[in-house]
């Protein structure tokens, strides 16, 4: 099963992380890497995991990035910069 790196920003002050954290930690048995970054094993691809996590976000301004650790396949919502524009 691939390992995904999940990074998020809940952008409004005072937002509660409980639903997202519960999904990441308990349902997906992920491990926190940084304050807002987790490592998660999941079947499927980055888009499938993003679709699974999306209901845990609080509002439309939240940001979420899911990236396969090995293949670098990724999916995101409201990213600050577009990954396609980053030169190797």
Regions of interest found by a model, annotated:
Residues 1-33, 37-40, 44:
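Extended, hydrophobic alpha-helical segments
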Residues 20-25, 59, 76-80:
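Short, structured coil/loop segments at alpha-helix boundaries
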Residues 23, 68-69, 83-84:
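Short, charged/polar low-complexity linear motifs in solvent-exposed/disordered segments
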